[in-house]
Amino acid sequence: MKLVVGLGNPGEEYARTRHNVGFVVADRLAQLAGASFTAKKFAAELAEARLGPERVWILKPQTYMNHSGEAVGAALRFWKLGLDDLVVVHDDLELEPFRVQLKVGGGHGGHNGVKSVNAHVGSPEYARVRVGVGRPPPRMDPADYVLGKFAKGEDAELDLCVEQAVEATRLAVELGAAKAMNQVNRRSRAAE
């Protein structure tokens, strides 16, 4: 069994914001798997699905970004899962917009949701699907930038990016992060 976590903030006011791209990917992954978010546990919405041979719980913390790790840590402990069973999808300021990259471990890059997950699972050594949102314009607060909505003209790019992130997540679940990284990151570089 695997746990896939989409990071975001609950509430309609955060829909379509850069910071909520993890929720968008989680929603699309559940939709493609024929699952829906009907369960509520660990202060999160949950959907049970199958990705290939793997049973997967897709989790969207409802604690707001800075406390996302509470739900993730509770779910890992409840199902007795290890860090190699965890895939977290989140926005990333350090990646150019609409670029998808898979990595294991590393720093949180100032992302408070990732920082919270690291603290509550005890390590950064888990798979992360990073979805690039780019850097804010000069003199703009990064918090305001990530809480800003994608422009209407970015819909096609966002949709394609979400599909790429869903595929990266699926590969991480089915193949394991190490094998999946080669495929995902090679595709991401080729798209440049």
Swiss-Prot record:
It comes from the Bacteria. Keywords: Cytoplasm, Hydrolase, RNA-binding, tRNA-binding. PROSITE patterns: PEPT_TRNA_HYDROL_1, PEPT_TRNA_HYDROL_2. The active site is at residue 19. The record marks 9 as: Discriminates between blocked and unblocked aminoacyl-tRNA. TRNA binds at residues 14, 64, 66, 112. One of its GO terms (biological process) is rescue of stalled ribosome. GO terms for cellular component: cytoplasm. InterPro entries: Pept_tRNA_hydro, Pept_tRNA_hydro_CS, Pept_tRNA_hydro_sf. Belongs to the PTH family. PANTHER family: PEPTIDYL-TRNA HYDROLASE. HAMAP family: Pept_tRNA_hydro_bact. NCBIfam families: pth. This is Peptidyl-tRNA hydrolase. The gene is pth.
